[in-house]
Amino acid sequence: MAALVIREFLEQHPEVELIMVSREHFADLFKAIPRLTFKGVSLDDYKGIFGMHKLAKELATEFNPDVVADLHDVIRTKILKRIFREKGYKVSVIDKGKEEREILTDVWNLDKKPIRSTVEKYADVFRNLGFPVELSHEFRIQQVQKSGIGLAPFAQHHGKMLPLEKSYELARILAKKHSLFFFGGGKNETEILEEWQHKIPNTTNLAGKLTLQQELQKIAELEIMISMDSANMHLASLAGTRCISVWGSTHYFAGFLGYGQKIEDVVHVKDLTCRPCSIFGDKECYRGDYACLEEIDIQQIIDKIQPGEKEFAEE
């Protein structure tokens, strides 16, 4: 999400050059942004408080920044923030809104309202440094031939993932009329998707076969991406592709809908008052039944791709 905000920020401020400091494997997310230098770091080289002091010294020496923006606000960046402030740098930090998140995820709160989107919170960091930013809230469709549908059926946490039997049935139905491409990561996910590919004609498993840059390019070439509330939804935004997103214990009210993606393309159980019970999907279901996922009908997804065409699972 940050990459799209940074791109628009830099477009609106041609006088600014930005140094993005993050883990090396995120470099491909920022490659196409003019006037951005990506500084990849290995956290193993900067352990503990002394490691953060070492990193801060290296960054100050190499880049001599005018100001510092913290878009993450985690333990490591909190240490860096303090070090840079002690050195006299102006530092702006994202406000994650802990209190409003707690109110939103209170299962007894029956009057839940959307909180400020994460992309606007990113933009606020730059605004607080004196740079006005107006976000378009639109992703940019790449000028490529689009065909096929992508399906990323996995998520990091149980509370965000449609039951695999539902995703499998969805794949079986969609592959009758569309070329279908599976996305995933890790050995277990790859093995499952390989099995699906063998069982379902007109499908291709891409899990474990592409670099991040290649994955972004493939997503850009898709007509539609189907994803859980996961990184693949945000990759679709970065690649300029419409994404139908599935939400379980999480909710787009928390501000994490993919940049430029439409609420109309959200699939969820609307009338469950306990949702969202979690911001990241990492909490156990207090009901014990994960109704937020079990009650999703895959026809909801099919209707957004093939309006008016009813499909029924084989007995």
Which positions does each model-derived feature cover?
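Catalytic machinery of carbohydrate-active enzymes
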Residues: 1-315
